Each structure stands twice: as C-alpha cells, then as structure tokens.
C-alpha cells in the first residue's frame, strides 16, 4: 500500500460495516453463539477518554476473533443514563436531563463509532427510555409481590449535597460516590430490597462461575457470611432481653460489659431508669453527626457513655455487667448490641482500658495486660469449658449449653445489608407504588406501566430532602387501584443501579413490548459467555445484577441461575503523569484527538499494546507513535507480497505467530500478541518477501486490533467478503517446533557458554559438544567429571572436581 491514508480508509470501512450490518447478531438458534459483554457507559457531558476505550477494547478483540471463528456473536452497547450527574447539571443550568442525556448519548455514540467498535448497533438500549424502564419497574413489582421489597424507617447514609439516601456501596469511605461530599447518618423512610435473603445463593453461585479469585474474594468479603450464636442477655430487674450475635460463644465467660448502638430503642424505653440521660442524649447527638465510616474506624479513640441505672446479666454465670453506648456499634449491623470480651478482642480491650472495666482472660496465651490475646488456646475461667483446647469443640459445647437452657442458639449473620433502594431526586425510574390510607402500599397495575416521569420545571429537591416529584400534585394525587379511594403516589425514584441490574437481558430482545425478553431467545443467548469490566464494580453492580438475575431465575423468568459464565477485569489508563485521569487534573486524553492525529487503528493497537491488560499504565505519546509506525510497516507488506503458498524461511514464524496470537487473545495478553506480530513482521522484512497467502494470514491475525487497515489490505489482496468475517487462521503444531535451539552450559552451577544445537539432539551428543566449547574447557581441563546432565531444550549441566 503506497499511501496509508487512515482517515479515508477508516471512514470507508465504518460506513460499509454500518450499511451491511456486519456486526448484527442473528437469532438463529442452530448456530454456536458467543455473548460478550462490557459495562455500558454512563454518558457524561465530558465524553469518553481513552480509559473507556481500553474498557471496551478487550472484549472487542475477543468478539472479533470469535466471529472469525464462526460464532454467532452478540456484542451489544447501551447507555446507563439515569442518575444524579445529569440532574445536578439540570439544577445548575435549567436544561432538562432528557435533553442533556440525549446530547451526551449522541456524543458517545459518535466517539464509539469513530473507534470502529464491532457493536451490534441495532440492539442499543437506553435505561431512561420508557420502553426500557417499563421492565425495570415490572421487575421491581415482581420483587414487591414476592416480599423482597419493604419500606422502613432507618438510619441511612445521607448526602446533604445531593439531598438523597445512599447505599453502603455508594458511600464507602464516608464519602458520597457521586459528588464526594461527606456523608451523614439520618433517620428516613427508606425503600429496601431484601438482598440479604439471597446472600447464601449469591455465595453458592460463585462456585459455579469462572471469576478470578480476587473478584470472588471481594464478593465473599462483601457478603461477609459468618456462623456463630444468638445469645439472650436479660436486663437486670426487667423481663427485657438484649439479644446479641457473636462468632465466639466459647468466650461468654469472659464477657465483662455490653455495648449498645446509641440509636438502640431500649435506651428510650428505659429512659426513666437511666440516671444520666442528659449525658446519653448529648452523646447521641454527637454520634448523629458522624458518618458510618467514621464510627467504625478501628484506629480511633474509644468514646462512649455508661448507662447508669441499667445493667445486664451474663446468662452463663449470672454476673451483673454494665451497659455502655458507643459509636462503634451500629444499629444496622447485627442486633445493634454486642457482648464485650476485652481479653480477646482488641477493640473491646481498648474500650475496657479507657473506661476501667474488668478484663477476664478465658483463653490461655499472650499478655492481656499489654493487649488482647486473639489466638487459640486452652480454655480457662470458663466452668465446664475449662481444659478444652480445641476452639471448634469449645464452641459446640457452648452452643449445646445455650440451646438446652433456652438462652441462645446457633445462627448466621452477614456483613452485607439490605439494599437501600431509593433516591429523593427526579432523574430516575419512578417507584410504581401507591400509598392508600385504607389498603396501605399498593402496586401500580401492570397494564399501567410504565409509570412515566412527569415534566417538571424545578429539579431542586425539597429542603427536607423530598423528591422534586412531591411538588407535582397531578403526579402525586391518584386513585387506589384496589379500593378506589383517593391515594398518593410514591415520589422517590430508583437508584442508578436499577437499570444496570438487568440490561444484559434486554440486549437479547430489545424491541419486545410484550415481555422483557422472549423465553426462547433467553434460552439461546444465556448465560453471558464472557463479561469484562472494571474492578471498582465487583461489590456493587456485579452483586446487584447477580441478585436480580437469580430472583428472575427463581420465579421462572430466565433459564439459568447465574448471568455471567465468566468475568474478567482490567487496569486503568493513567495520565501521562502516572495519575488516574480526571478533568480536574487536566491529564485526560480524548480519543478523538488521537484518532485525528494517528487514526483509530493506531489508538486501538496502542491501547492493547501499552501494558498487560490487567495492569494500570500511563499514557505515552511515544508509544502511540511507535504503534503508528508498526501499522505503516504492515501496510507496506502489500508492496512485497507475491505468489501463493508458503515461504520456506517464514513457515515456522508464521505458524508460531498464529498459535501465540490465538492463545494470547484468549488469555487477554493482548500486548504480547501484538509483540508476536511485530516480531513476525521483522522476520518478514528480513526475508524480504512473503506470499499473498501469508499476507492473508497476517492480516486476519491483526484484524481484531486494527480492523480498518486490515479490511483495506484484504480488499487489495482480492479476497472475498470482509476480513472481519473471514476464517480465523489455523496453524500446524509440527511447524511451531524450532529446528534449532540455543542451550546453556553450566559448570559447577554457573553458566559458562551457550551454543546452538538441533532441537532433537540426543543427550550424549549435546554433552559431547558442550565439552568441546573453548569457554567450557577453561573450567574443565584437568578436572574429573563427577556429573553430566542434559536437560532437553534448556541446558547441559557439568559438575567437575580436581583429579
């Protein structure tokens, strides 16, 4: 190719792919299928940066290869467009989120198409489209019908800036995941999804999917299943029970105090018995100003207040013990109260030291004057457990003791909490519930879905955190579908995670208005064969979507229990300064700028070549230029290709390259796949020629990475059809074996020389040749050979000593 005009070439092939529908999946159930999935983008006003390109390029390469291998490939794209950023922009500018969202989607679509992604654009969906969120609401109502949706007053994570409730997942580190403001605790009426009822199913499902170990571990840790015991402590001189959960019931004899969450309802119930209630109330007010993150930090001063006049009784020994309140105990975790064993829990030990509370050791080991002993050992000071030195046995004995006396039982707890599922904002799916003074909470009838967002002029939430929808009387006021009485609509909306919890199902049948997807199509396409996405979503979106899917499986709406057969991750593209790209740092690289200067194929190739796909790496302009030169050299191969068949000198390298690129793509080792093609190109240039058949092979290998150039070269070769749908090259394993290999020679453990031998050389011959090497003789002349060993393909090992 005399002139590699990437601008003309790339537009030409993008237009042809679109015109011919090259990448459309077809619902032909007789074909082998491959469903490749990426995390769909949130269409922000800033547009995409090159990090987005990397996020989509890994699965892009895999899907292009699968298509060339004869699979019916579904590789779709969507836009996760509900959420606070668009609404905050609307509040600031007065521009409706619908207008902003449509503009941003148009911008993102253009960027994606200019890169040349092989998406099936006929299946694009948008979570803000009523045809889509109708089914989001339908799934919500199915959960409501099956008791997985409930409303409760609770202390929740609340962002004063966004004026909305946040889930634990959206407020990690005590910061709002949306605006990064500090989160506070606030008592509000909250919609919850009972995700905890699916905790065991979510854990069990991990055994049946191909997820990396670190992703499985993060999900397991987030769910946080523990086994232990529920134990009932009575409040002195009352019939009241203070119920706690512990993973170490064997240490009950070491309990010397209890701690309740400042919000615990028993405090108010027995306020008349608590003589220092003023001090308690003051402390409770201070706790209310702290985030959950601040309250649960391990490394902080221990604060609290003793409840004077209120004590508990240790059920295993009858001892009266004090009760404190402290910020590190949360009402939403466990039972809102804990038993404290300061001898064997460091946080309890710190608290006991701060408040002068007794410390009773019940497990031998350590020096409890200096710190808590958290290891195993022989039980002491524990009545019937004394002398037992097996933790499991001690726990079983105590569980039996508790059960016999009716003061406790074996139990299971989870760190994961039920999912706070509402926002007091406008730009989200309306929650399809009606509040009737007679019937209570009533579902919007299915035939009235979608419940559409009304037009509003003011997007500001109310000062008390009410949704903007609460201001619209025509939306709020309605009739109860059960009894016909005047009623009120729910005015909260769903969180952004709602639409992304099932989008992979809608891709399968995006235009169906009778159901979210046809059962036969679901049976054919599910599960997703390979899902690639960011590591930041493995404890939020990935858990949420698995939960929704498993629920749909349980009610017979989908054919498989797990949505994703395989999941993989990727590293970030950092700025040239080595820091994560962000607009505020000014280190964002716009893919459009790279495409204008170097071309989409260069961008695609560099993104895949810059580092191991799973690693984060800085953007380097020099690397981009290097990939541009590589593609220019590839383009020039057209000028030297002639004839058919194989070139003897290239036979080995061509087969090796096909083998390596094929395997590296499967392993997501895209950088080494490209490196192998670069090595092959160097050998071709050293030989000075190649056949058209060999060029055809090379082009097909490169096509998933640089498809525009490869399509142009394919056409110039006179090949039929498109390179993107041509057959993936095969290789001959026998041709992948080197005729000659280089091996090392060690003398007394140190490498003294290297030499080339036939790959199939016999051991005796290899050893004999090694002994004749001049550099080896320097260390063996006059010496006695004690050991002679040939490790095939690697080395000759000689051990000598003076004669």
Can you describe what each PLM-predicted range is?
Residues 2-14, 50, 136-364, 466-468, ...:
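NTP-handling and nucleic-acid-processing catalytic cores
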Residues 64-72, 92-98, 114-118, 145-151, ...:
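Secondary-structure transition/capping motifs at alpha-helix termini
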Residues 4, 225-230, 364-367, 372-400, ...:
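Long, charged, mostly alpha-helical binding arms that flank functional sites
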Residues 12, 16-20, 92-242, 247-249, ...:
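Residue patterns forming the tRNA-binding/recognition surfaces of aminoacyl-tRNA synthetases
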Residues 443-480, 485-489, 495, 744-748:
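Long, His/Glu/Asp-enriched segments that create or flank divalent metal/ion-associated functional microenvironments
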Residues 26-97, 124-139, 246-247, 314-351, ...:
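N-terminal catalytic cores of NTP/NDP-binding nucleotidyl/phosphoryl-transfer enzymes
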Residues 1-37, 67-76, 100-107, 283-325, ...:
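Conserved oxyanion/phosphate-binding beta-strand-loop segments in alpha/beta enzyme cores
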Residues 80, 145-157, 161, 251, ...:
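Helix-rich, typically C-terminal accessory recognition domains appended to large enzymatic cores
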